[in-house]
Amino acid sequence: MNGYSVFCVSDHTGLTIEAVAKSVLAQFPRIEFSLITLPFIDDAAKARAAAGRVAVTARALVFSSLTDPALRAHFKDAGLHVFDLFEHVSPAVERVLGEPATPSGGHTHGMASDYEARMDAVNFALRLDDGLSPEHLGQADLILVGVSRVGKTPTALYLALHYGLRAANYPLTPDDLANDGLPRALQPHLPRLRGLTLAPERLAAIREARLPGSRYASVAQCRSELDAAERLLAAHAIPLIDTSRMSVEEIAARLRAS
């Protein structure tokens, strides 16, 4: 079966409707979906252009969080398959509350300040990626630790982009693991440390794609590093998440809850 192109249309960043679309589409694992986010569709010209783009795309679906009915109409009038967050949810909420909804143009999260906070968190995650700028670790909400390629960077960026959390990440190198002690840069920050680990075979496959045939990518090397890292984290009572069968969304949700 051919896949579907899924357009996530929003009058702001598109993060909310993209998350909704991913959650819904995950219920259909046998079908392939390609997500395209169309953010900041906040006037008629942009809505017409976006609807036109979708209309010429084969097997297209639209998930929309447009708050303005006039903008939503461009997609409906084009005869597209539209799944609209506000059109389906808001009327039900209005009936319960006895209060009409007021379109807020993307301010569903207090967006102006919230958006700035998320972008600041993303910049922080990039500045403190892979052990960079350890002198600023004290500013982090969470510090992700683990051996190379266990998913620290994408998880830190997801936490920043979706939750506004300032997440740093710090690699545990073979030299660190040989010392049987936490790297000095991490020692003052124990309450904020969170460990990530993987099945050795999964880690080896990820590393093999980066450095084929290397010792770094061997299952034996991966198992040795992971075992040493897990012992080190356990010795310091640092919470550890096995990400082998988890999506980055699930990992981030677990970390946020912690």
UniProtKB/Swiss-Prot annotation:
Lineage: Bacteria, Pseudomonadati, Pseudomonadota, Betaproteobacteria, Nitrosomonadales
Record's catalysed reaction(s): [pyruvate, water dikinase] + ADP = [pyruvate, water dikinase]-phosphate + AMP + H(+); [pyruvate, water dikinase]-phosphate + phosphate + H(+) = [pyruvate, water dikinase] + diphosphate
Name of one Pfam family that matches: Kinase-PPPase
Protein's UniProt keywords contain Disulfide bond: no
Full protein name: Putative phosphoenolpyruvate synthase regulatory protein
EC number: 2.7.11.33, 2.7.4.28
Similarity-based family: Belongs to the pyruvate, phosphate/water dikinase regulatory protein family. PSRP subfamily.
Sequence positions that bind ADP: 146-153
GO molecular function: ADP binding; ATP binding; phosphotransferase activity, phosphate group as acceptor; protein serine/threonine kinase activity
Organism from which the protein derives: Thiobacillus denitrificans (strain ATCC 25259 / T1)
Function: Bifunctional serine/threonine kinase and phosphorylase involved in the regulation of the phosphoenolpyruvate synthase (PEPS) by catalyzing its phosphorylation/dephosphorylation.
InterPro entries: Kinase-pyrophosphorylase, PSRP
Enzyme class: transferase
Keyword Transmembrane helix: no
Keywords recorded for this protein, A-Z: Kinase, Nucleotide-binding, Serine/threonine-protein kinase, Transferase
